[in-house]
């Protein structure tokens, strides 16, 4: 909109980067052979690599969803539109962590907080966003 200094436009580039990182980290953890000596037949256990990759992918997905939710919320705000009735509570929770942009501010910090809130809700540590509890 004219006169608006704040925008979520550049989230698209960052979201693409997050999707690429998710793809890279989601590759299977392989077992590389130890090539230190001809008689050495030990292998490196891939569990730690898989664990780190799972943590990274989880965080990237939270960040990607936070960017998507913030951008959708901003689109509604810029158009002076209300979300569908079934999404109102969700959008209110998104805006609690990422208010609509109407000027300059640290959007990265807000996205980080929103991603943290998504992660907490998914793990059942929060009732936000109307997500069902995991069993």
What are these regions (language model features)?
Residues 1-135:
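C-terminal auxiliary extensions adjacent to catalytic cores
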